[in-house]
A protein has these predicted regions:
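Short, intrinsically disordered, charge-balanced linker/junction segments flanking boundaries
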Residues: 1, 168-174
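Canonical Radical SAM [4Fe-4S] cluster-binding loop centered on the CxxxCxxC motif
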Residues: 1-10
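A short, N-terminal amphipathic alpha-helix
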Residues: 10-19
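Conserved AdoMet/S-adenosylmethionine-binding subsite of the radical SAM
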Residues: 22-25, 34-170
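Short acidic donor-binding/metal-coordinating loop in glycosyltransferase active sites
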Residues: 30-31
């Protein structure tokens, strides 16, 4: 059970009733928002009609669903997984990376404020990380990105500071 279900109207009312004077954007994140892409799109349109920017963080497993919500989103953080990530099995990785790269390309083409995030662990191989960087920077220039986040896992397989600095040193030249 993932909590209480709300209709779009109920969710819009919750948003309206809980906006604060200092609310500067509304985030769609946690779990995977694209699983409910139609609802995210409707809620994002509602938020934008209130004059607030919208932010989506997604692993972009489905570029068609991403394209559906993209017009209603202002800020995008696209989460990439390395080939050796334990979050997805090897045989599905090529399709995931294809979709994620398509989403990145679409966000840049749509002139969205775009961030990239790569989650790394102590098990992340430098070769896998470098290969992913090459794929990313074949289609995007750093001038088109608002940020590049290297996010360490915590508790389980947490990378050392030295490992994080090596990953950083490999992103920096781009």
């Amino acid at each position: 059970d993932s909590g209480k279900e709300y209709s779009i109207t109920e969710a819009c009312n919750l948003i309206d009733n809980n906006l604060q004077d200092n609310t500067y954007k509304v985030n769609f994140t946690g779990g995977e928002p694209l699983i409910q892409h139609e609802a995210v799109n409707e809620l994002a349109k509602h938020v934008k009609a209130r004059g607030l920017p919208t932010y989506l963080e997604s692993a972009c497993f489905d570029s068609k669903k991403f394209l559906h919500v993209l017009p209603s989103i202002d800020f995008v953080k696209i989460e990439f997984k390395t080939a050796d990530s334990e979050f997805i099995d090897e045989k599905h990785y090529p399709n995931l990376i294809k979709n994620t790269l398509e989403c990145l390309h679409a966000a840049i083409d749509a002139k969205k404020t775009t961030y990239i995030k790569i989650v790394v662990s102590s098990k992340t191989e430098l070769s896998s990380f470098k290969e992913l960087l090459e794929q990313i920077f074949k289609i995007v220039s750093k001038k088109n990105l608002s940020g590049f986040i290297i996010q360490p896992t915590t508790s389980i397989s947490e990378p050392t500071l030295e490992q994080l600095l090596v990953f950083y040193d490999n992103v920096y030249p781009y």
